[in-house]
Amino acid sequence: MTLREDLTKAVEEINAYYKELEGESTRAAVILATCSLEDELAKLIRFKKFPRECNDDTWDIIAGPTAPLGSLKNRANFGFAFGLYGEKTKEIIKQIGVVRNKFAHWTNARDFHHPDVMRETEKLKNNVISSFHVGPSEPPLVIRQQFLWLVQTLEDRLERVRGHIEELDGPLTPLP
């Protein structure tokens, strides 16, 4: 493939992702956004902590679905342990995973007003990345938008950490 074809494909994939994210149910949107965050976290860990010689087969042994780095929680802990971000970011990532799991594994959790989803989402309201309002008086669609904004903002910040080259970019302000 040429560079133009690669870029065209990447743009098409990004557009399809956002179209799907906007048009899906709350359950699907939360799962999809969190999967994207999880993928970025895996890229960050692989790029920053594993040698270039770590091929896809080896990476699957390390980070495949049933591997030690196969879960969002384990990836969050690993990234923190190796100094890719601070304790607060680790806890935010893990809590996003808890909310995602409520939607993924509970058939009656369809929006953010489900009591268990609300309780877990409230733990994110004062986070240092993108705080937001959560509560029974907030419309579920507003909570959804704020939650997705948090996930996307965190994913973008992790991507910046992954792409940062200190010799070229200078010191990086670490994630809390």
Residue ranges and their predicted role:
Residues 1-176:
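Amphipathic alpha-helical interface elements
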